[in-house]
């Protein structure tokens, strides 16, 4: 009797034998517009890979070699592996003149595939894990973390949620998963070397492929970059965000208070008011720093025909944003990224927008100088953020700031930091009165819907929200906590 493992492999092999009869880029991408897409998508994917000059690269699911030759141009050596013999033969006929490529016909899941542990600098795959069962993905993650050197990288790109290509298929055994499945499997993966040192995978990045957002309004093409690190390496802040402040249940709880799609003060109402101040024009490019679950980004893209790039350090936030994007057909791309280390070319954006996020950033002057570089001449920045009074904080307020890891400034000092970064026409408004009105309205709504809230979440969640909002109202009433609106131009 066939095992589930053998059945899965046979189904996938037969599917790819059928789609490899015509060894073209259209067949590999399963899309009639593949040639045009490939021109944008391939350079984008290659640009996202960590540096691999002179390094050893293992390409899993190499197919006809769409990426193999490009990888060989910079790598020290490339092992190009695929389980369809005709595909790897085509790859070799196209790229065989590169003497640093070893071509292998093998199934990545096969126990017969022997790759030495700790021998690879970069593992690269493009559309591979979606053709493996859940259990095979887990086993594959364990093999990959073993094969890669400490400090080395794993890059993979998958179709999530639903298919992207328009090719007709008699059957489709592809596993279109939620992105959080891959994130969880690779985050939980650990290994020990022969000396007993423990290693895990640290997420370096996770984002949608922009070419698919631009050409198909489709956010389901997602790539991940992981680095093999010692277990003791510090990932505390991202872990704090995802396991404490912004764990999945907490995000849904915040959303109930702020309104569908929103996790910052005033939800849709304040978003509509502040976005109106940015004078958005069709075709402009907006960067949303701390985009949360994407409500403001969808609003901007749908109502002003702009292209929005939303970044957030919280994996959970971006996972929700990607799920909410399904079916909206809007020009928004999302990425798990740290705004203090992320790089964009100078003059990339028309507008930079950030809502109640920069309070987490300790070196605001450096961030604002970076924003200034990223903005095009004539560009604009709009920020709302938690602030404080210019007086010395009380011990209680100082403890709150310390416990949250916030960096708070008074409204005028905050505006001055924008001026010092090079911005002109800086508006720095104390919007604390508006903040108080919004807090009261949000608190009233939660208290009114107490039974429903407790039923959907828990009594502890209800008490946390009511306690948290009441404490914010006390801190604003004492004059210690403020809320600022900042708008500035790059001339």
UniProtKB/Swiss-Prot annotation:
Gene Ontology cellular component list:
cytoplasm
Keyword list, A-Z: Acetylation, Cytoplasm, Lipid biosynthesis, Lipid metabolism, Methyltransferase, Phospholipid biosynthesis, Phospholipid metabolism, Repeat, S-adenosyl-L-methionine, Transferase
What does the record note as the disruption phenotype of the gene behind this chain? No visible phenotype under normal growth conditions. The triple mutant nmt1, nmt2 and nmt3 is seedling lethal.
Residues that, per the record, bind N-methylethanolamine phosphate: 245-246, 254, 386, 400, 404-406, 472
Q: Name one GO biological process term.
A: methylation
Binding locations of phosphocholine: 159, 164-165, 169, 176, 254, 386, 400, 404, 406, 472
Q: Name one Pfam family in it.
A: Methyltransf_31
Its protein name is: Phosphoethanolamine N-methyltransferase 2
Question: What species does this protein belong to?
Answer: Arabidopsis thaliana (Mouse-ear cress)
**Lineage of the organism:** Eukaryota, Viridiplantae, Streptophyta, Embryophyta, Tracheophyta
């Amino acid at each position: 009797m066939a095992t589930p493992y053998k059945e899965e492999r046979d189904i996938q092999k037969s599917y790819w034998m059928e789609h490899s009869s015509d060894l073209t880029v259209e067949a590999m991408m399963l899309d009639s517009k593949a040639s045009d897409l490939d021109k944008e998508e391939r350079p984008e994917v290659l640009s996202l890979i960590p540096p691999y000059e002179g390094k050893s690269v293992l390409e899993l699911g190499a197919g006809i070699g769409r990426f193999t030759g490009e990888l060989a141009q910079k790598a020290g050596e490339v092992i190009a592996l695929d389980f369809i013999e005709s595909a790897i033969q085509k790859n070799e006929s196209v790229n065989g003149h590169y003497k640093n490529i070893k071509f292998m016909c093998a199934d990545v899941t096969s126990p017969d595939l022997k790759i030495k542990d700790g021998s690879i600098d970069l593992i690269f795959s493009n559309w591979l894990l979606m053709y493996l069962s859940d259990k095979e993905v887990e086993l594959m993650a364990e093999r990959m973390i073993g094969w890669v050197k400490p400090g080395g990288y794993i890059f993979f790109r998958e179709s999530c949620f639903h298919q992207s290509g328009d090719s007709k298929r008699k059957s489709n055994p592809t596993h279109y998963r939620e992105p959080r499945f891959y994130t969880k499997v690779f985050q939980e993966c650990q290994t020990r070397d022969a000396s007993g040192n423990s290693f895990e995978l640290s997420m370096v990045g996770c984002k949608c492929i922009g070419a698919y957002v631009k050409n198909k309004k489709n956010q389901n093409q997602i790539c991940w970059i992981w680095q093999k690190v010692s277990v003791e390496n510090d990932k505390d802040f991202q872990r704090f965000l995802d396991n404490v402040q912004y764990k999945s249940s907490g995000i849904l709880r915040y959303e109930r208070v702020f309104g569908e799609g929103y996790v910052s003060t005033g939800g849709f109402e304040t978003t509509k008011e502040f976005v109106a101040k940015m004078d958005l024009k069709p075709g402009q490019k907006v960067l949303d720093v701390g985009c949360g679950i994407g409500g403001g980004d969808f609003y901007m893209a749908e109502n002003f025909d702009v292209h929005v790039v939303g970044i957030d350090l919280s994996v959970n936030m971006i996972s929700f944003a990607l799920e909410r994007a399904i079916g909206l057909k809007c020009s928004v791309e999302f990425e798990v990224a740290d705004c203090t280390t992320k790089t964009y070319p100078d003059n990339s954006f028309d507008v930079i927008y950030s809502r109640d996020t920069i309070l987490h950033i300790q070196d605001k002057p450096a961030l604002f100088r970076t924003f200034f570089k990223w903005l095009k001449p004539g560009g604009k920045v709009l920020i709302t953020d938690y602030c404080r009074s210019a007086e010395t904080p009380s011990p209680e307020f100082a403890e709150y700031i310390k416990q949250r890891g916030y960096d708070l400034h008074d409204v005028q000092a905050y505006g001055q930091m924008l001026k010092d970064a090079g911005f002109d026409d800086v508006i720095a408004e104390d919007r604390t009165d508006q903040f108080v009105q919004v807090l009261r309205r949000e608190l009233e709504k939660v208290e009114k819907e107490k039974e429903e809230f407790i039923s959907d979440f828990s009594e502890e969640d209800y008490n946390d929200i009511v306690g948290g909002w009441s404490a914010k109202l006390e801190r604003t009433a004492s004059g210690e906590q403020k809320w600022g609106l900042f708008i500035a131009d790059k001339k």
